[in-house]
Amino acid sequence: MEQRKVSVAAHYKLPWFLTSFARVLDFVSKGLATRFLWRIFCGPIKFKVPSREAEFYNKTEQEMIDAESVSKKIMLYQIPNDGRRILFVHGWNGRSSQFYRIIELLSDNGFDITAVDLPGHGRSIRSNTNLPEITDLVSELTKSRGPYDGIVCHSFGGVAALNSVRHGASCEKLVLISPGVYEIKPMFKTFVGLFGLDEE
């Protein structure tokens, strides 16, 4: 059976020193290498914010809060209005300001907006995180800051929002943008492959 060659886009290529260190660890101990890779896997990357998103920060009220469910500090953004209440949840390696066009349109039409930078993302305090933690955070926000008439979410944030609703969080509407249906094991195997290591 022919082995399929996987090409990695330039912006996903990892620094040589990181891949080299992972390979040395893998040679010494598979267990150590796995723990090292898992730690990196759960660590969001903070990308540079483009200038087009600057207006989002000018228009929102910002508050760093202590999220009890995850014991971490996270950044909340709000545009108070008298209309229906919407919560925005971004995807992995994302940030709230990526919703700037949708948020501007909705707030101009009277919607009350709340957006969250997930743990380790955007302007929240740098930290590792994972799906169960983000699910707990969305549930906490719906209880402590809600109720919300709708939750708008992207990719990984959609998976967390679906899980939180499944576990009792309430909202009238759930809007999923490019929802990911993730199984962690295949995702982690692909991630390990980026280091040039045996995915098994």
Specify the residue positions occupied by each region the protein language model found:
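Active-site glycine-rich loops that stabilize anionic/oxyanionic intermediates
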Residues: 83, 91-94
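An N-terminal hydrophobic leader/cap segment in hydrolases
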Residues: 10-66
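Hydrolase active-site cap/lid region
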Residues: 169-200
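Conserved alpha/beta-hydrolase fold motif
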Residues: 150-152, 174
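Alpha/beta-hydrolase active-site loop
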Residues: 127-150
